[in-house]
Design a protein with these regions (language model features):
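Amphipathic, interface-forming alpha-helical segments with heptad-repeat character
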Residues: 23, 31-34, 52-165
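Single-pass alpha-helical transmembrane signal-anchor segments
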Residues: 2-20
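Structural motif marking the loop-to-transmembrane transition
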Residues: 1-3, 104-105
Length: 165
């Protein structure tokens, strides 16, 4: 009988110790309770209720770079162009970031590529290659407005390559 109490006490001690979560700097832990969003914990030590709460995501708030590698686009004069870009962003709202889409970086990449293709399809190939700054600014405005709904702050979208195929 005493062994049962010792085992039970050991389980309680281990569960209690495992329930304290230390969140590092520039990181947010997203916690779900009973399968739905409960809270987001910032830097510091937090208590997670055993068997009820679950840390479902550990999100970095540090600035991140997302490459957009060698995609194709067609200009208004039906010339194929190859483009590569770099997207710099940071997470501003962990709840929106973790709950809005299944894979937010992939959605951001897809949205950026679609915006580039839309802008490039409206101009000729020569104009597209000459006016890369204008294209970047137009795409940046479109993408940053949409990315705010996903809890992201897009700080820069830079074309690294725009050339004829």
């Amino acid at each position: 009988m005493i062994y049962v109490f010792i085992a039970l006490a050991a389980v309680i001690i281990v569960m209690t110790a495992a329930s304290f979560k230390k969140v590092p700097p520039e990181t947010v832990f997203v916690v779900e309770r009973a399968g739905s969003f409960y809270a987001s914990y910032g830097e510091g030590v937090h208590f997670v209720v055993p068997l009820l709460d679950k840390v479902t995501a550990k999100i970095s708030l540090a600035p991140q770079c997302l490459p957009l590698e060698k995609a194709a686009a067609v200009s208004a004069d039906q010339v194929s162009l190859r483009l590569s870009a770099l997207i710099r962003f940071s997470v501003t709202d962990a709840q929106k970031y973790s709950c809005s889409t299944e894979n937010t970086p992939a959605a951001l990449s897809s949205l950026t590529l679609t915006a580039f293709r839309n802008v490039i399809s409206a101009v000729s190939a020569g104009d597209a290659v000459k006016s890369q700054d204008t294209i970047e600014k137009t795409v940046f405005r479109a993408v940053s407005a949409a990315a705010e709904q996903w809890g992201l702050n897009v700080s820069e979208i830079k074309l690294t390559e725009l050339s004829l195929i």
